[in-house]
Amino acid sequence: LPQRFVHPLHDEQVVVVAGGLVLLLALRGRTARPAHHSVLFGADYDTEFDDLRAGRPVADPTVYVSAPDDPALRPDEDHEAWFVLVNAPAHDPAGEGGGRGTDWDAPGLAEAEADRVLALMAARGLDVRERLLWREVRTPADLARGTRSDGGAIYGSSSDGARAAFLRPANRSPVPGLFLVGGSAHPGGGLPLVGLSARIVTELVGPA
């Protein structure tokens, strides 16, 4: 970009905190009438965000489970494919984020955290460990590499503070013809808001 469009970004202005730890599970057998969406809460939701701000894996995370009853997502009627997500600190291998993240490439960390999430699910009444055929673990480091999101922070900048939602980059940039879309831009992260971000940019660009 031309230098006049490049604005220095300081840690106190743009802070990324939360990424996601994802488990993709292949399970034998079928769950009787599974809920498509399940949210398994820990004992204290507030402490989850204390851990994230401190840059450490959440001790007692909320676990989101998607168990779609969709024939297109499983090989046959005797198997299931689940998506599991917990909040996780952003990937920060060199401590460049001021201690606000974790080195998710550290040997053994991803698999250990995946085991812990499965144990938490079991403790909260959703034990699938004996049914597990295969799993893939995706960490904030993988998300950073795959999506180029800073630290794998899939929700963009921190949402702390009453004004945080208004500090996200606008969809129309100062550079003519350059538009911003996705979880790091207005209005924010998560599939519904990312879809809305795309709609806003579509309307800004106008018909071809």
Q: Residues of each region from the PLM?
A:
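Mid-domain catalytic core of redox enzymes
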Residues: 1-76
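C-terminal structured subdomain/cap of oxidoreductase catalytic cores
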Residues: 1-4, 11, 20-31, 79, ...
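Histidine- and/or cysteine-centered catalytic micro-motif in compact active-site loops
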Residues: 28, 68, 87-89, 137
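Flavin-binding catalytic cores
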Residues: 30-31, 56-58, 102-142
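Short conserved micro-motifs at the rims of enzyme active sites and ligand-binding pockets
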Residues: 33-38, 75-78, 93-98, 190-193
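A glycine-rich dinucleotide-binding beta-alpha-beta segment and adjacent secondary-structure elements
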Residues: 60-64, 123, 127-187
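Amphipathic alpha-helix from the class-I
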Residues: 88-104
